[in-house]
Structures are given as structure tokens and as C-alpha cells.
């Protein structure tokens, strides 16, 4: 039988043994990829500077997912938070990678076994002796087992009852660590930024799944519903499974892009909305005003700002700044951050403090404009010097640095002032090493951007797959060419392939 490439899956349509085999092989490939990718990332990951060169700047993709579940130590003697480790144990990054690779091998062997021993009595109807699957019963079993797993994760792993807990941090991504989380059963549990909601929702969903599984194991579907939803057809299973997967993909694309407790910024990088809303800038401003209220000097106030917080307030860490087709990590774009130069304060010759207008997310270039505290334009870098009125030279702008490496240093040279004004457009000013990785200076997206793009794209494709297979199973008789005016109630091709001349057309 010659099948076109897009129809090859027909070979497992009525072959439950080999259907199991191909699913085992698929799981083996997924598990093997995860373990291998983890080992590759560990081989290229530099853990030496968790503040200025975190995992998300280095383009790590699977390490953040391991970390948010409680893995923080490596057999290489380092931990994600910067401490030295002597005995990482089996539940280290390498340990988890090895477990996935071993599991992949076992699944591979199981897939081969099921491919060879495909014709098991388990899959045959005792009454007819033909291959058949009790799909509603299988659905109940799967629902029950996934409910147990979901409940176990929420009740034991996340809460720390039997497990490490999950990664928890403050809203500004400064104090993150793995810790047990108590379930949040009130309205706050529905806040996507409250970690307790992860525990309570898994517990609640798990209980619901267990009860629903038991229901489907003990209650048979009515005949009208069974036939109406084509519950005897394995393509119905495919269609509804695709629906579950694309729905989950859309949800996680949203929680990743907009941010949530499940996608901490220390592991995946900040969101674009934190730049758009000046989230970190406002927190820095609040801290400076608080320090000034304690009669600290500007230099002392800015020196108290954590370098980590200042680094978040830099447009190069915005995942929406990198083009989707610019391959590579953020470090391959603007370079490896070496140090914070300090906060630049601009003043004109009349003593007005000037603020550089920050570049919006979707601009590649943006005019350099300096405004006073009332929003009045006082200086700029003109496009045409012949018509300029507010140039740095004419207005006499100087720049002073507070905190960071240039603390207390000021510049009045127009060329230098303009250089720092351009860089202040991009947020706090940092020094970057572009030589080590031959970085090209073009912004890249973070794993947050890649994950969102990938899952949103595949969710859309899977949505069409759901429609396609759902239509095929619901209108199977129409597509098979059965006369719609046929008086006899016929169950056509329930367990046999379409076009099989031995298929019985039995009047029900």
C-alpha cells in the first residue's frame, strides 16, 4: 500500500499495539532531547556572574525550567545563586539531565518491544475477536492518573511536604530562591503573580481530575452521546487531545509574555511591559527619594541601588527589542555586561535637571531629547545643526554620575555628554564586553520571547489540526461517500479502515 507522506499515520489507525509503540518512541525523543539539551546548556553556561550575566542573558532555555522546580546545584561545584557547592547530590542539573537520558533509553526499548509484540489479547474484543479499544474507559484511566500527578505536584512538591518547593521572588526579581509555598485558597490565589495559587490550583485541579476520572471509569456514556461524539473512533481522541494541547500552549504563551509567578524574571528575564510602564525606574526612584528623606547624599543614595535592579532597567533586557529571526542569546547582541557606570544626571547651564526621553520598545532609532521636570524640552541632539536651538553645545549641558563605577565623575565636553545622552535613552548605562563573543551590537530577544513565539505559533497550528481532525471524525460518513438519504441507521467503519471491502455494513 503506497501512502503519501501526509497519510502515513494511517498505519496505526486500527493497530493499538503499534499506536502505543509510536507514542513511547515520541516520549523517548522528547525526554532524550530535554536531557541532551540540558547537558549542552550546562557545557556552555557561565555561572560566574548571576547578576550581570544571568541564565536568560546567556540564552539558556531548559535550565530556567529546571530551576523554577527547585534544582539549583551543579556537579561542577556551583549553584545558581553564586555559592560554592560541595555535594550537589542526584537532584542536580546534571542528575536531572542524566535521568531524562536514561528514561529516554528505556522508553526507546519499550517502543521497540511494543512494535514487535503488537497483537496482544488485551486489544481484542472478547465477543467479536476484533481489535477494539474501550476509549471512554481509557479516557477515565488517563484522567484519573493525570489528576493524581497534578494533585501530588501541588500538595507535595510545591508545598515542600515532599519536595523542594518552587522558585519564589519579590516583584523586582532581587531576592529569588527555592522555597516551599503554602496554598492560597482566597481570592489572592487567582492573582497570576501569587505563587500560592500554583499550589492551590494544582491541588484543586488534581482533585477534580481524580473525581472526573473515577466518574468516567464507573459511568458509561449514553448511546446517543457515544455515537454523536464518535467515541468509538480513535480520531476523536486525536482531535480532543490536540484541543487540550493547543489550549495549554495558548495559556502558557500568555503567562510567559505577560509575566506570572510561574515565569520569574530572574530565570526568564523581564517582560516588555516592565520597560513600557517604567516598572523598575519607578522602584529605583522610590528608593532614591526614601534615601534622600534619610538625609543621604545623591551619591550615597544611588550607591545603595542594587546593580541587579539597575540592570533590569535597561532596554537591552526587553524581550520585545530582539527580532524574532535574530538567532542567538542576548549576550551575542549588545555583549556581556561588565559593570554599571552609575546613574547619569544631566543639567543645563541654568541649573535645570534634565531627563533623557527613553526609547519606546518598538523604535530602533529615536531622537535624543532632554526635558526638565515639567516636560519642557530644554536640549536635544539635532538632526540638522544649521537649524538647532537646543543643541548640547548651545544649552551647555553637563552630565554627572552617581553610584556605579563613575560615581562622582562629571563631564562637560559636548562629545562625551552626547555619548552618554544617547546611552541614557536605553535606560541605566552599562559597560559591555563585545569582544569575547564577537557581539554585533544588535539587540536579541530573551528565552521569554522565544518561548512565547514558539508556543503561540504552534498553538495556532494545532488549533487548525483540531478543526481538521474533529471534522474528519464527525463527518466521516459524509467523507466516505455514504448516501445522506440512507434510511437504515448504519455504524460505518467503526473499527475497520475506510475502503476495506470486508467491513460489515450492519443495520443497528
UniProtKB/Swiss-Prot annotation:
Cofactor binding note from Swiss-Prot or TrEMBL: Binds multiple chlorophylls. PSII binds additional chlorophylls, carotenoids and specific lipids.
Lineage of the organism: Eukaryota, Viridiplantae, Streptophyta, Embryophyta, Anthocerotophyta
The name this protein goes by in its record: Photosystem II CP47 reaction center protein
Any one Gene Ontology molecular-function term assigned to this protein's record: electron transporter, transferring electrons within the cyclic electron transport pathway of photosynthesis activity
Pfam families assigned to the protein according to its UniProt record, in alphabetical order: PSII (PF00421)
Subcellular location: Plastid, Chloroplast thylakoid membrane
Keywords carried by this UniProt record: Chlorophyll, Chloroplast, Chromophore, Membrane, Photosynthesis, Photosystem II, Plastid, Thylakoid, Transmembrane, Transmembrane helix
Species of origin: Anthoceros angustus (Hornwort)
NCBIfam families: PS_II_CP47 (TIGR03039)
Protein topology in the membrane: Multi-pass membrane protein
InterPro entries in the cross-refs: PS_antenna-like (IPR000932), PS_II_antenna-like_sf (IPR036001), PSII_PsbB (IPR017486)
GN (gene name): psbB
GO CC field: chloroplast thylakoid membrane; photosystem II
GO biological process: photosynthetic electron transport in photosystem II
Biological role: One of the components of the core complex of photosystem II (PSII). It binds chlorophyll and helps catalyze the primary light-induced photochemical processes of PSII. PSII is a light-driven water:plastoquinone oxidoreductase, using light energy to abstract electrons from H(2)O, generating O(2) and a proton gradient subsequently used for ATP formation.
Subunit and partners: PSII is composed of 1 copy each of membrane proteins PsbA, PsbB, PsbC, PsbD, PsbE, PsbF, PsbH, PsbI, PsbJ, PsbK, PsbL, PsbM, PsbT, PsbX, PsbY, PsbZ, Psb30/Ycf12, at least 3 peripheral proteins of the oxygen-evolving complex and a large number of cofactors. It forms dimeric complexes.
Transmembrane segments: 21-36, 101-115, 140-156, 203-218, 237-252, 457-472
Family: Belongs to the PsbB/PsbC family. PsbB subfamily.
Amino acid at each position: 500500500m503506497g501512502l503519501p507522506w501526509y497519510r502515513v499515520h494511517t498505519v496505526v489507525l486500527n493497530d493499538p499495539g503499534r499506536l502505543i509503540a509510536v507514542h513511547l518512541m515520541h516520549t523517548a525523543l522528547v525526554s532524550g532531547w530535554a536531557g541532551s539539551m540540558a547537558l549542552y546548556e550546562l557545557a556552555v553556561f557561565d555561572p560566574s556572574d548571576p547578576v550581570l550575566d544571568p541564565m536568560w542573558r546567556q540564552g539558556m532555555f531548559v535550565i530556567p525550567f529546571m530551576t523554577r522546580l527547585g534544582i539549583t546545584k551543579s556537579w561542577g561545584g556551583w549553584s545558581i545563586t553564586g555559592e560554592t557547592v560541595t555535594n550537589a547530590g542526584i537532584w542536580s542539573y546534571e542528575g536531572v539531565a542524566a535521568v531524562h537520558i536514561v528514561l529516554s533509553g528505556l522508553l526507546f526499548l519499550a517502543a521497540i518491544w511494543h512494535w514487535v509484540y503488537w497483537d496482544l489479547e488485551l486489544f481484542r474484543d472478547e465477543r467479536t475477536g476484533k481489535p477494539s479499544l474501550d476509549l471512554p474507559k481509557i479516557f477515565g484511566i488517563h484522567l484519573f492518573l493525570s489528576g493524581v500527578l497534578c494533585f501530588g505536584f501541588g500538595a507535595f512538591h510545591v508545598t515542600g511536604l515532599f519536595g523542594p518547593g518552587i522558585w519564589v521572588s519579590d516583584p523586582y526579581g532581587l531576592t529569588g530562591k527555592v522555597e516551599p509555598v503554602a496554598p492560597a485558597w482566597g481570592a489572592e490565589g487567582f492573582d497570576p503573580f501569587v505563587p500560592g495559587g500554583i499550589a492551590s490550583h494544582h491541588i484543586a485541579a488534581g482533585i477534580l481530575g481524580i473525581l472526573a476520572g473515577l466518574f468516567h471509569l464507573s459511568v458509561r456514556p449514553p448511546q446517543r452521546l457515544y455515537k454523536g461524539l464518535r467515541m468509538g473512533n480513535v480520531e476523536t481522541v486525536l482531535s480532543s487531545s490536540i484541543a487540550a494541547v493547543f489550549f495549554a500552549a495558548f495559556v502558557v504563551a500568555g503567562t510567559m509574555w505577560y509575566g506570572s509567578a510561574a515565569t520569574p524574571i530572574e530565570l526568564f528575564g523581564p517582560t516588555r511591559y516592565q520597560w513600557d510602564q517604567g516598572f523598575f525606574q519607578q522602584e529605583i526612584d522610590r528608593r532614591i527619594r526614601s534615601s534622600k528623606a534619610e538625609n543621604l547624599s545623591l551619591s550615597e543614595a544611588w550607591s545603595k541601588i542594587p546593580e541587579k535592579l539597575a540592570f533590569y532597567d535597561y532596554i537591552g533586557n526587553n524581550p520585545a527589542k530582539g527580532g524574532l529571526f535574530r538567532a542567538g542569546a542576548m549576550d551575542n547582541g549588545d555583549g556581556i555586561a561588565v559593570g554599571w557606570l552609575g546613574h547619569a544626571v544631566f543639567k543645563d547651564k541654568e541649573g535645570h535637571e534634565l531627563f533623557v526621553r527613553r526609547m519606546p520598545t518598538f523604535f530602533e532609532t529615536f531622537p535624543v531629547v532632554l526635558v526638565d521636570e515639567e516636560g519642557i524640552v530644554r536640549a536635544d541632539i539635532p538632526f540638522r545643526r544649521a537649524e538647532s536651538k537646543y543643541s548640547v553645545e548651545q544649552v551647555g549641558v553637563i552630565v554627572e554620575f552617581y553610584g556605579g563605577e563613575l560615581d562622582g565623575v562629571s563631564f562637560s565636553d559636548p562629545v562625551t555628554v552626547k555619548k552618554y545622552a544617547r546611552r541614557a535613552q536605553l535606560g541605566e548605562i552599562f559597560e559591555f564586553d563585545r569582544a569575547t563573543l564577537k557581539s554585533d551590537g544588535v539587540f536579541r530577544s530573551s528565552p521569554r520571547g522565544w518561548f512565547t513565539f514558539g508556543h503561540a505559533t504552534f498553538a495556532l497550528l494545532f488549533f487548525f489540526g483540531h478543526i481538521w481532525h474533529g471534522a474528519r471524525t464527525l463527518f466521516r460518513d459524509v467523507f466516505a461517500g455514504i448516501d445522506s438519504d440512507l434510511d437504515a441507521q448504519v455504524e460505518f467503519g467503526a473499527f475497520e479502515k475506510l475502503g476495506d471491502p470486508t467491513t460489515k455494513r450492519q443495520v443497528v
